[in-house]
Amino acid sequence: DVNELNDVEERRAVVPQVWEIDIMITKHNDEIIQIEER
């Protein structure tokens, strides 16, 4: 949905810290998953 996408972009513009933290958490979780797969 284009409107939903625009809402997300607007929220990111207002609070860039939030999605940066989300990305850090995602990367952290990916690393944990990789460690568990070994």
Swiss-Prot record:
Keyword annotations: Glycoprotein, Milk protein, Secreted, Sialic acid
Q: Which domain of life is it from?
A: Eukaryota
Description of post-translational modifications: O-glycosylated. Contains sialic acid residues.
**Cysteines joined through disulfide linkages:** none
Expression tissues:
Found in the whey fraction of milk (at protein level).
Q: Which GO terms describe its cellular component?
A: extracellular region
Question: Per the record's keyword annotation, is Secreted included, yes or no?
Answer: yes
Where is this protein localized, as stated in its record? Secreted
The record's note on quaternary structure and interaction partners says:
Homodimer.
Q: What is this protein called?
A: Very early lactation protein
Q: Which organism is it from?
A: Trichosurus vulpecula
Provide the taxonomic classification: Eukaryota, Metazoa, Chordata, Craniata, Vertebrata
